């Protein structure tokens, strides 16, 4: 009996020990598999909830963005920095944009143009249009009678009264093309008529006839500039005449560039400030500082920017920082933070500047841009930057400096826009805003040619000294009339003629 009880107790103890001993490896694996299965189910459930949440949020964002971009106000905000009918410009202008962007631009501007054409005129505008159309009919009668001088004056009067009327532009263009042999200006008026009324079949037919001829003339002009550039490049840098010309032109560049912005310093006073750093009596501190800022910017170009393969936003900011370095050090090198208005042009808002400047930088360094003729490239860059108007002040000076930087990199001397030509300068910029940048490019080409003529004349064997600049408007008009021919010889021109259209020099 005792033996039986003992065995029973041993059996109980063995079962107890069996229940308290650790599990075997097989049990452990089963437990781990169950835990992993449970974790996998939980993880999949969480992932599903996350995906559903992101899908709902993404769908809502896409719907909101579509609704926003479909509104006309959003399109206006994104596209108002471009001029009306910009899609009609030369194909070099939009080659860096995608097909979708081009279609968006065209759709937007087609609507804006049709709206502007169909807009109601004020009573005064209607009166001017009626008078302009009357003058137009009378001009055509005078032309048929053989009185072309009177007809020309009547056409000009009609254009002054209604400069944006397609019929006036069309008929005056035909008169210029067939009677005055001015096919370039005629093509410009046909272009404007099409910009205002794209469905005008007569303007379209005329434009198709003149466009190729005008393009050929422009290309020949650029080839002529290249020939003069090569002739200047053949002159050795050690030439004393070339060094004198560079030094004199350097003073004139600063004088003209600040003069366009309203600075009243004379050329002699500008030269004195740069050479002596002494103040001029009767002139404001800002006028002194504008000259010193241009001097700093031009030295920066000569020392650094000309040698760079690519020009970045940082380089443009550094250039602007020097332009305003003495006038407004706080705003120098900074994008504006407020909306500005420049005559009838409304530049983009400050919130759009970063994106637009990034696009401008991308265009500036693109392969397409580098394939353009240097004069076209420089003129486009000048216009694009001044149109964006990224700074509170100094946009014009910075744009002209950038233009000259690009020209100098291509072997051209830096050119000047004479202060006497200020009204033409702004007029051609206005035409570019309205859709045709070609007149502005031709204006820059004119300035480039006069600069080249200046250097070629100054380095010739003629005994005269480098002349002083003509500064009066009447003298400028007289010299302009004498230099209408684009192929005038440098050796045959008179001394003042060159300096009326002279370009800037770089620091020797």
From Swiss-Prot:
The record marks 261 as: Important for autoinhibition of adenylyltransferase activity. TPR repeats lie at residues 132-165, 166-200. It catalyses: L-tyrosyl-[protein] + ATP = O-(5'-adenylyl)-L-tyrosyl-[protein] + diphosphate; L-threonyl-[protein] + ATP = 3-O-(5'-adenylyl)-L-threonyl-[protein] + diphosphate; 3-O-(5'-adenylyl)-L-threonyl-[protein] + H2O = L-threonyl-[protein] + AMP + H(+). It comes from the Eukaryota. The chain crosses the membrane at residues 48-70. GO terms for biological process: detection of light stimulus involved in visual perception; histamine transport; protein adenylylation; response to endoplasmic reticulum stress; visual behavior. The keyword Membrane applies. ATP binds at residues 261, 342-345, 393-400, 425-426, 433. Protein that can both mediate the addition of adenosine 5'-monophosphate (AMP) to specific residues of target proteins (AMPylation), and the removal of the same modification from target proteins (de-AMPylation), depending on the context. The side chain of Glu-261 determines which of the two opposing activities (AMPylase or de-AMPylase) will take place. Acts as a key regulator of the unfolded protein response (UPR) by mediating AMPylation or de-AMPylation of Hsc70-3/BiP. This is Protein adenylyltransferase Fic. The lineage of its organism: Eukaryota, Metazoa, Ecdysozoa, Arthropoda, Hexapoda.
């Amino acid at each position: 009996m005792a033996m039986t009880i003992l065995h029973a107790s041993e059996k109980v103890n063995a079962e107890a020990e069996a229940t308290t001993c650790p599990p075997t490896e097989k049990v452990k694996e089963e437990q781990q598999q169950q835990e992993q299965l449970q974790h996998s189910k939980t993880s999949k459930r969480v992932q599903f909830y996350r995906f559903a949440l992101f899908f709902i949020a993404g769908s809502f964002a896409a719907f909101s963005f579509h609704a926003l971009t479909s509104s006309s106000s959003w399109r206006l905000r994104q596209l108002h920095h471009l001029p009306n009918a910009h899609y009609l410009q030369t194909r070099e202008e939009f080659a860096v944009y995608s097909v979708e962007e081009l279609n968006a631009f065209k759709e937007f501007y087609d609507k804006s143009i049709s709206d502007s054409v169909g807009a109601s005129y004020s009573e005064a505008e209607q009166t001017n249009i009626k008078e302009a159309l009357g003058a137009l009919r009378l001009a055509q009668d005078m032309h048929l009678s053989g009185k072309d001088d009177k007809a020309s004056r009547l056409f000009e009067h009609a254009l002054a009264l209604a400069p944006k009327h397609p019929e006036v532009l069309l008929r005056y263009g035909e008169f210029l093309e067939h009677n005055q042999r001015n096919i370039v200006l005629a093509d410009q008026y046909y272009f404007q008529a099409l910009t205002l009324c794209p469905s005008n079949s007569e303007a379209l037919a005329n434009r198709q006839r003149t466009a190729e001829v005008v393009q050929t003339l422009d290309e020949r002009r650029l080839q002529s500039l290249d020939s003069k550039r090569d002739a200047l490049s053949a002159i050795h840098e050690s030439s004393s005449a070339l060094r004198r010309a560079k030094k004199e032109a350097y003073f004139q560049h600063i004088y003209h560039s600040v003069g366009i912005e309203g600075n009243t310093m004379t050329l002699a006073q500008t030269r004195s400030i740069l050479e002596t750093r002494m103040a001029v009596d009767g002139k404001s501190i800002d006028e002194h500082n504008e000259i010193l800022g241009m001097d700093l910017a031009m030295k920066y170009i000569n020392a650094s920017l000309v040698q760079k393969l690519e020009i970045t936003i940082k380089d443009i900011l550094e250039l602007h920082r020097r332009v305003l370095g003495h006038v407004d050090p706080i705003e120098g090198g900074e994008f504006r933070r407020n909306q500005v208005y420049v005559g009838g042009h409304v530049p983009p808002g400050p919130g759009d500047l970063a994106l637009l400047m990034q696009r401008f930088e991308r265009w500036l360094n693109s392969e397409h841009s580098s394939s353009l003729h240097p004069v076209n490239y420089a003129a486009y860059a000048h216009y694009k930057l001044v149109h964006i108007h990224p700074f509170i002040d100094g946009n014009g000076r910075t744009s002209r400096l950038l233009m000259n930087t690009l020209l100098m990199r291509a072997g051209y001397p830096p050119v000047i826009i004479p202060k006497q030509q200020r009204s033409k300068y702004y007029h051609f910029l206005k035409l570019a805003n309205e859709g045709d940048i070609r007149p502005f490019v031709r204006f820059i080409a004119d300035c480039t040619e006069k600069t080249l003529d200046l250097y070629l004349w100054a380095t010739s064997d003629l005994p005269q000294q480098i002349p002083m600049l003509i500064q009066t408007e009447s003298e400028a008009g007289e010299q302009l009339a004498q230099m209408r021919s684009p192929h005038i010889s440098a050796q045959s021109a008179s001394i003042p003629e060159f300096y009326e259209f002279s370009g800037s020099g770089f620091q020797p």
